């Protein structure tokens, strides 16, 4: 309904049970640190050990800080929440059995946080 009414995508896609996730993954950096380090932090997605998406936060059309501020105007944002912010170029289909790994990493390559799942 929200999409049909041309309301913001976030409101069209964010509702209870809209995304099922596996185990929680630790992140060894705080969100306020990411706000200061957007030039040094990147996102990478591999499917079956092949990099399909990779870019740095500085290249996002809307910064993480701006996204959190805008979302906070109409929804509570709490520590531990997952925020789906869009992705770098390279969006593509997934198939049953695909191994998917998402990583948040420092510019020097050190991984800050990672998530792994197999599509079912």
Regions found by a protein language model. Give the residues of each.
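Catalytic-core "active-site belt" of small-molecule-metabolizing enzymes
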Residues: 1-82, 90-120
